[in-house]
Regions:
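Bacterial N-terminal signal peptides that target proteins for export
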Residues: 2-15
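Bacterial N-terminal signal peptides
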Residues: 12-24
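Sec/Tat signal peptide C-region and signal peptidase I cleavage site
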Residues: 25-29
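An aromatic/glycine/proline-enriched structural segment found at the starts
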Residues: 30-31, 197, 201-205, 218-222, ...
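Mature N-terminal segment immediately following signal peptide/propeptide cleavage
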Residues: 32-74
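M16 family metallopeptidases and their MPP-like homologs
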Residues: 58, 63-76, 85-87, 103-196, ...
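Active-site recognition of the HExxH zinc-binding catalytic motif
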Residues: 84-96
C-alpha cells in the first residue's frame, strides 16, 4: 500500500511537471503575437514590441546565415535647413561607438567631446576667415586629445569577429538603413551590439569623419549625372526637400556642422517606434524576437514624432527645361512627378517603364536602341514616401542633339498611350516580374530588403 502511494505521488508529480513544462513551452511560443499576410510566399511574421519597435522576420534555411537591416524612418528629407547633409553624416557617425565600446576611457574622453561640440557651435557662426582658421586649430588640438581614448574601427572589428559580412549603411530621402549579414548562431550577439549602438551612440572623430563626407561631396561635384539629377528634382519639387536639398548636403553646411543639431536629430528620429528591424535567413522566430526584445525592449519610445510637413507641390502645367553645364558626354533627363511609392499608380508606372525599356522588347529597345537611332535611352522610377518620379534617360549619338533624342523618346511614349505595341508585350512583362520575384526568394538580401522598401 505504501509502495502504491509513493508511485501515485511520483506519477502525480510527473504529470504536474509535464503539464507545467507544456504550459511553459506554450506560453513561450505564444509570448510574441505577430501579424502575417495571406498567401505570402516568404511567410513573413510582423511583430510589434511594446515600445513600438517593428520586427519583420522571414525564415529561409538555404544557408546558415541571416541578412539584417535596421531601418530608421528618416532621411535627408528631415535634414534641418541650416545643416543639410545631417542624416547622411549621422549615418557615418553611427560606426564610431557607444558608451560601451569605441573608447578606452569614456569618462576621461567626455569633457573633450563636450568641448568639441561647444566649439563647433561657435565656429559655425564665425565668418572671418582668419578667426575661423584659428578657432578650427583649437578644435583640432582638442580633438587630438580626445583621440587618445579613441579605439578606431572597433565596431567593424566586433562585426568581423562574429563572422559578419557586408557591414554597410545608406541614407536616402526617407530612410537611413544599417546592414549586416551574420551567421545564424550570432543573432543574440548582433542584437546586443545593435541595441547598444542605437541607444548609447557617442559622436567621436567628428571633424576627421567630416573630411570623409566632404570628399564624397567633392566627388559628387565632378559627376554630371548627379548634377542633372539634382536639377531635375529641383524643378519637380520646388518647395519640398526632395528638390530643395540633396542627401549629401550643401558644401556651406558641411563646412559649418553642428554636433548639437545631429544629437537633436538622433534623439528625435532614432526612437523604437520609428524603426523596423528586418531579418531573413536561418532563424528561429521566437528566439530571435526574444533576443531583440532583451536588448531593445527597454528602449523608451517617443510620445510624438514631429515630422516636418510640407505643402502640396504646385501643379506642373507646362514643360520646364533646364540646362546643366558639365564636362561629360551630353545626356537627357525627362521627369514626371507622380504619387507616393505606396500608391497603386507606382505599380502602373513600373509596368509602363518596362513597356518602354526592358533591354529587349520595349518600345525604346525595338524602335530606338536596336535601330541605332540614339546612343542610349531608358525609362525608370524613383520612388519616395511622398512622391515618385517617372523618368526617361537618354544619350545622343554622334552629331545628334538632345532635342532630337527628346523628340524620339516622346514619340515612343505617344505610341504607348495609343496602345501601339505588340499584344504579347504586356503579358510577357507581367510574367517576367513574377519570374524575377520567385527566383529571388532564395536570396535573403532580396527578402529582407522588401520589408525596408
Amino acid at each position: 500500500m505504501k509502495k502504491h502511494f509513493l508511485n501515485s505521488t511520483l506519477m502525480q508529480g510527473l504529470s504536474l511537471g509535464l503539464l507545467f513544462l507544456f504550459a511553459s513551452v506554450t506560453a513561450y511560443a505564444q509570448r510574441y503575437s505577430y501579424e502575417s499576410i495571406p498567401n505570402d510566399p516568404m511567410q513573413t511574421r510582423i511583430y510589434t514590441l511594446k515600445n513600438g519597435l517593428k520586427i519583420y522576420l522571414s525564415v529561409n534555411k538555404e544557408k546558415p546565415r541571416v541578412q539584417t537591416y535596421i531601418a530608421v524612418r528618416t532621411g535627408s528629407r528631415n535634414d534641418p535647413k541650416e545643416t543639410t547633409g545631417l542624416a547622411h553624416y549621422l549615418e557615418h557617425l553611427m560606426f564610431k561607438g557607444t558608451t560601451h565600446f569605441g573608447s578606452s576611457n569614456v569618462e576621461a574622453e567626455r569633457p573633450y567631446l563636450d568641448s568639441i561640440e561647444a566649439r563647433f557651435e561657435q565656429y559655425r557662426h564665425i565668418t572671418d576667415p582668419a578667426a575661423r582658421k584659428q578657432w578650427y586649430h583649437q578644435i583640432d588640438s582638442i580633438s587630438q586629445l580626445a583621440a587618445r581614448y579613441n579605439i578606431p574601427n572597433e565596431y567593424d572589428k566586433m562585426m568581423t569577429a562574429i563572422g559578419s559580412e557586408g557591414t554597410n549603411a545608406y541614407t536616402s530621402n526617407d530612410v537611413t538603413c544599417y546592414v549586416e549579414n551574420i551567421p545564424s548562431n550570432e543573432i543574440d550577439t548582433w542584437a546586443r551590439v545593435q541595441g547598444d549602438r542605437f541607444q548609447n551612440m557617442v559622436i567621436r572623430g567628428f571633424h576627421t569623419e567630416l573630411e570623409a563626407v566632404y570628399e564624397e561631396y567633392n566627388i559628387g561635384l565632378s559627376s554630371d549625372w548627379r548634377k542633372v539629377y539634382a536639377a531635375l528634382f529641383a524643378k519637380l519639387f520646388p518647395t519640398h526637400p526632395y528638390g530643395t536639398q540633396t542627401t549629401i548636403g550643401l558644401g556651406e553646411h558641411l563646412k559649418n556642422p553642428s554636433i548639437t543639431n545631429i544629437k537633436n536629430y538622433f534623439n528625435k528620429y532614432y526612437v523604437p517606434n520609428n524603426i523596423a528591424i528586418c531579418l531573413s535567413g536561418d532563424l528561429d522566430p521566437d528566439k530571435t524576437v526574444a533576443s531583440i526584445e532583451k536588448y531593445f525592449g527597454n528602449w523608451k519610445p517617443s510620445a510624438h514624432i514631429d515630422v516636418p510637413q510640407f505643402p502640396a507641390q504646385p501643379a506642373l502645367t507646362a514643360p520646364v527645361d533646364t540646362t546643366v553645364v558639365g564636362k561629360e558626354a551630353p545626356m537627357l533627363f525627362m521627369g514626371w512627378r507622380a504619387d507616393a511609392s505606396k500608391s497603386l499608380q507606382l505599380d502602373t508606372l513600373e509596368v509602363i517603364a518596362q513597356l518602354l525599356s526592358n533591354g529587349q522588347a520595349g518600345l525604346f529597345d525595338l524602335d530606338l536602341s536596336q535601330k541605332l537611332k540614339v546612343q542610349e535611352v531608358s525609362a525608370g522610377i524613383a520612388d519616395m514616401d511622398e512622391y515618385s518620379v517617372f523618368y526617361v534617360y537618354g544619350q545622343p549619338k554622334s552629331g545628334q542633339t538632345l532635342q532630337e533624342v527628346r523628340s524620339l523618346a516622346l514619340s515612343e511614349i505617344e505610341k504607348l498611350k495609343k496602345g501601339n505595341f505588340s499584344d504579347d508585350l504586356l503579358p510577357s512583362i507581367v510574367n517576367n516580374y513574377k519570374r524575377y520575384y520567385y527566383t529571388q526568394l532564395d536570396n535573403n538580401q532580396f527578402r529582407a530588403k522588401q520589408y525596408v522598401d
